[in-house]
């Protein structure tokens, strides 16, 4: 099976677990890390600000399990629009805490179209721990 098919299939299975009663915009995420694979889906809340994005859900699982290095990010959004599925700004910043600038971020839409980015392309001026020195 092709790489695209494996990750798209897993993301497609996960996306149905998203809790999105308000926006109906589902997102699933897989992180390849120093501890293996971690998954997340978006979880909405009626107050909106407590909503958790799929990427941060996966990062939380990774950290809870004792791991801290992200090597690859895979994301599926339930849209057929090209290029709509990149992480939001908050998620980009959170990912930058645990991933290198050259970390691949691979996104899919529901048609299975695949788009490639690096974290640095999506967050060129990341605020990081070096800024706090």
Curated annotation (Swiss-Prot):
Binding site for Zn(2+): 53, 88, 91
Pfam families found in the cross-reference section: dCMP_cyt_deam_1
Top-level taxon: Bacteria
Residue ranges of every copy of the CMP/dCMP-type deaminase domain listed in the record: 2-130
A GO MF label: zinc ion binding
Cofactor binding summary note: Binds 1 zinc ion.
Residues that, per the record, bind substrate: 42-44
GO biological process, one term: cytidine deamination
InterPro entries, sorted: APOBEC/CMP_deaminase_Zn-bd, CMP_dCMP_dom, Cyt/Deoxycyt_deaminase, Cyt_deam_tetra, Cytidine_deaminase-like
Active site per the UniProt annotation: 55 (proton donor)
Needed cofactors: Zn(2+)
Catalytic EC class: hydrolase
CC annotations in GO: cytosol
EC number of this enzyme: 3.5.4.5
Keyword entries, A-Z: Hydrolase, Metal-binding, Zinc
Catalysis: reaction(s): cytidine + H2O + H(+) = uridine + NH4(+); 2'-deoxycytidine + H2O + H(+) = 2'-deoxyuridine + NH4(+)
Keyword Metal-binding: yes
PANTHER family xref list: CYTIDINE DEAMINASE
Annotated function: This enzyme scavenges exogenous and endogenous cytidine and 2'-deoxycytidine for UMP synthesis.
Family membership: Belongs to the cytidine and deoxycytidylate deaminase family.
Quaternary structure and interacting proteins, as annotated: Homodimer.
Protein name: Cytidine deaminase
Gene that encodes it: cdd
């Amino acid at each position: 099976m092709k790489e695209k098919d494996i990750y798209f299939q897993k993301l497609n299975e996960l996306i149905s677990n998203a809790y999105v009663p308000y926006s109906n915009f589902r997102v699933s995420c897989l992180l390849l890390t120093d501890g293996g694979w971690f998954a997340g889906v978006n979880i909405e809340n009626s107050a909106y600000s407590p909503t958790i994005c799929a990427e941060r859900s996966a990062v939380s699982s990774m950290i809870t399990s004792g791991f801290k290095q992200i090597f690859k990010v895979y994301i599926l959004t339930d849209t057929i629009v090209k290029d709509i599925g990149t992480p939001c700004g908050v998620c980009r910043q959170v990912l930058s805490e645990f991933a290198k600038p050259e970390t691949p971020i691979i996104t899919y839409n529901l048609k299975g179209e695949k788009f490639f980015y690096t974290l640095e392309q999506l967050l060129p001026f990341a605020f990081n721990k070096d800024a706090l020195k």
